[in-house]
Regions:
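Short, acidic, metal-binding catalytic loop of nucleotide-sugar glycosyltransferases
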Residues: 31-40
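A conserved acidic beta->alpha catalytic loop
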Residues: 47-57, 76, 98
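Glycine-rich, basic loop-to-helix element that forms the pyrophosphate-binding segment
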Residues: 73-89
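Flexible acidic/His/Gly-enriched loops in nucleotide-sugar-dependent glycosyltransferase catalytic domains
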Residues: 78, 108-182, 252-259
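Short aromatic/hydrophobic "clamp" motif used to bind/position activated sugar donors
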Residues: 94
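Conserved nucleotide-sugar donor-binding catalytic segment
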Residues: 150-243
Length: 317
């Protein structure tokens, strides 16, 4: 029988786990939740139409955990699955754990500490460790270098929202603990296959209070050949451009310091140079005012017609 747990100090936290064809990883992911030094008040797992036996493994791991519930559905995509799980959950805060990642043991305790010390926050993100397909921590390589670059830019310019556009130092939805009020206000995770995490972060900075705890590792992100972000780089680039255009539309000058000085110009120019998305950004900025809501805009921006058009521009003939 399901039983909501409320025995911990601080706010209630639900952990939601979207599962899709990760039978190799799901046991260790769930164990990282069960071994928390400050327990989750509930665990909601949804299998998103997997074709492997990951759901059976998850049920076995959670069998003796009355605060856990597991569901199955037809494949609906990560953003829909996360939204459904959050809708089922009851806590004040939500922590997402993708089924191939791990929480560090003190993640939830640390988030409760931060809320207690600094007051209510709408989103908390921490430091990120990197592991390989076999769960070995990595000290070098492409992903480690990417995270290092992202921190270097943030440390240099001190513009957290613009720095996310440059390189997403939060890395993944697994590194987000956020308030239910933020999720409600955002309209949930948007219909983006690759960048729903970045869009949600942009909204969090625009909407409320964000705590960055980057010097303490909160999660371990698994890098493997089946990471969704590796599927179709041309479509990834379209989604990134759309999210940046939306951030420029909604946040505008708040991406920069109040001074609008030479340092801001340098930071912004470096982001544009690094992303190399000027053609798409200019187009999206031109059409964005025609759409009443960002979900409607994203539906247009990620349509097959537009993706094909941009692909032809980038690779004519």
């Amino acid at each position: 029988m399901f039983k909501f747990l409320k025995k911990t100090e601080g706010p209630t936290i639900s952990v939601v786990v979207p599962l899709y064809n990760h039978s190799r990883y799901i046991a260790s992911a769930l164990e990282s939740v069960l071994e928390q030094t400050s327990s989750a008040d509930e665990i909601i797992l949804i299998d998103d139409g997997s074709t492997d036996n990951g759901f059976d493994i998850a049920q076995r791991v959670l069998a003796k955990t009355p605060r856990a519930r597991a569901f199955r559905q037809e494949n609906a995509g990560a953003h829909n699955t996360i939204n459904r799980a959050i809708g089922i959950s009851r806590s004040e805060y939500v922590a997402v754990l993708n089924s191939d990642d791990l929480f560090t043991r003190r993640k939830l305790e640390r988030c409760r500490e931060l809320i207690s010390q600094r007051g209510p926050a709408d989103l908390i993100a921490g430091g990120v460790g990197i592991m390989d397909d076999d769960g070995r921590k990595q000290r070098g390589g492409v992903a480690v270098d990417w995270l290092a670059r992202s921190r270097t830019f943030l440390d240099q310019f001190g513009l957290p929202q613009l720095s996310l556009i440059n390189e997403n130092y939060v890395a993944t939805t697994s590194n987000m603990v956020f308030s239910r009020r933020l999720w409600d206000a955002s309209g949930g995770f948007q219909p983006l296959r690759y960048c729903h995490d970045l869009d949600f972060l942009m909204f969090a900075f625009e909407f409320g209070s964000v705590i960055l705890d980057l010097d303490e590792e909160h999660i371990v992100y698994r890098v493997h050949e089946r990471n969704t972000i590796k599927e179709d780089l041309s479509r990834v680039r379209v989604e990134i451009a759309a999210v940046i255009a939306e951030a420029l539309h909604q946040s505008g000058p708040r991406l920069l310091s109040p001074a609008f000085n030479e340092r801001d110009v340098q930071a912004f120019a470096e982001v544009m140079k690094n992303k190399q998305l000027s053609d798409m950004l200019c187009f999206f900025q031109t059409v964005r005012p025609a759409f009443a809501a960002r979900g409607e805009f994203y539906g247009y921006a990620t349509s097959d017609m537009l993706s094909t058009a941009f692909r032809r521009i980038v690779s004519p003939g």
